[in-house]
Amino acid sequence: MKKLLLAAVLALTTGMAFAQGAANSKKGAPAAAPSAEEQTIRARLEQTFNLKPSKVSPTPFGWYEIIVDAEVYYVDPQANYVFNGSVIDTRTRQNLTQARKDDLMKVDYAKLPLDQAVRIRVGKGTRQFVTFEDPNCGFCRKLHNDLKGLTDYTLYIFLYPILSPDSTEKAKGIWCARDRAATWNALMLEGKAPPAAPADCKHPLEANLQLGRKLGVNGTPTLIFQDGSRMPGASSVEAIEQRFAAAKK
């Protein structure tokens, strides 16, 4: 379905979207959208693409923002054109689309089931964050090597075996080990494979996979901070420190 939607995007160029935004931004904030326009948009999208947006909202540049499966698109009031891409406020240089996506992808940190995660504490451990990681993830190993330069934190690792069947076996071995944190670090930092898990060992791997899918975690590592923001990939210590600082505000 997304391919169909992207095909419709070809009917509108990025330049046209920016021009439309510049022209309408001079008019100030839009008036309350007539319900008829929203009904037209919803009906047209459902009829053409079989899409049911979770939200349809007016924008400052005259078009409508539609949310479909945490993705952001834009349509004109008659739903004749669909635009998929970044809209930039030329006055502030802010990427309005990315800001909206970041907001949509925020996680309720307080509701994360941290009892399903491997806990690693460094120093006093006052600063917290969460990762979703696969035992066979090369970027995860890079992340943990970089974390040697980070102090005073508690990391909760949701074992998220999505790369191979072997990932599942290793994840079981880590969770069922006597010292989960040490076993994880031995794998990430030294390349030591975890011991095989006992056949009767209970683990939260399926629950972790369901949680990750619900949160839209598509790759490892994915980092989540206490303010609900997330950061994909092997992030630098500097970037993590910046997120810690932002989470305090």
Where are these regions (language model features)?
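Short strand-coil-strand connectors
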Residues: D69, Q226-D227
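Acidic-aromatic/histidine active-site loop/patch
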Residues: K192
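Conserved NTP-binding/hydrolysis module of P-loop NTPases
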Residues: I174-C176
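Conserved, helical-rich catalytic subdomain that frames metal- and/or nucleotide-binding sites
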Residues: R178-A181, N185
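Extracytoplasmic thiol/disulfide redox context detector
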Residues: K2-A7, G15-K172, A186-L189, A197-T220, ...
